[in-house]
Regions:
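Bacterial N-terminal signal peptides that target proteins for export
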Residues: 1-7
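Intrinsically disordered, low-complexity segments enriched in polar/charged small residues
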Residues: 7-9, 180
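C-terminal motif of bacterial Sec signal peptides marking the signal peptidase cleavage site
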Residues: 15-18
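Calycin-type beta-barrel ligand-binding domains and close structural analogs
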Residues: 20-38, 46-183
């Protein structure tokens, strides 16, 4: 139990610190945000049912994501671009006043009671010789890529590379364990 908690905490820390590609700007404009009621509820990792995320409705078109350990709460917006769904998440206000609330993009596929996620691959970005050829504005902070481009630029990238599993990798499958009846 303690090991599972530690592994989940480390995964969450990696998500919101430096092991992922973050962006200063969102992947969405208000017209791009969609709400999918089927996401509401609790989703457990296929490999570890004790590690899960609960999606709750937040505002008109948003989500509040809470980890099973309650160690991290994220705000999320679901974005539909060229038929693909992306979840744009940021730390919940007040989680860390010293942290810039960067955006993290997660490609998702939802099929019944199965949710598959894929994250932008930081290693792929690091190995790409010239990010400028990708049409992305960025800076490097402590050798990590931080995207700085406007929303339209980020969306063009997501549309172009959303189907590439070398760009959106780190696949994780979840299964629904509870449905939110307050849809």
């Amino acid at each position: 139990m303690r090991l599972r908690f530690l592994l989940t905490a480390l995964t969450l820390a990696a998500l919101m610190t430096g092991c992922t590609v973050r962006s200063l700007n969102p992947l969405y404009g208000e017209k791009d945000v969609v709400f999918e009621p089927a996401l509401l509820g609790t989703w457990a990792e296929h490999d570890d049912a004790s590690s899960n995320w609960t999606f709750q409705k937040s505002g008109e078109n948003g989500y509040r994501l809470v980890s099973s350990e309650g160690t991290k709460t994220l705000d999320g917006r679901l974005v539909k671009l060229s038929g693909r769904l992306f979840l744009d998440v940021t730390p919940k206000d007040g989680d860390d006043s010293l942290e810039i609330p960067a955006h993290l993009f997660i490609k998702i596929e939802l099929s019944g009671d199965t949710l598959r996620t894929a994250m932008l691959d930081a290693d792929w970005f690091d190995k790409t010789a010239d990010l400028k050829t990708l049409g992305l504005s960025y800076i490097r902070i402590n050798d990590k890529v931080v995207l700085t481009g406007p929303t339209k630029e980020l969306q063009s990238f997501a549309v172009k590379y959303g189907g590439d599993e070398t760009v959106f990798s780190h696949l994780q499958d979840y299964r629904r364990t509870a449905v939110d009846l307050a849809k």
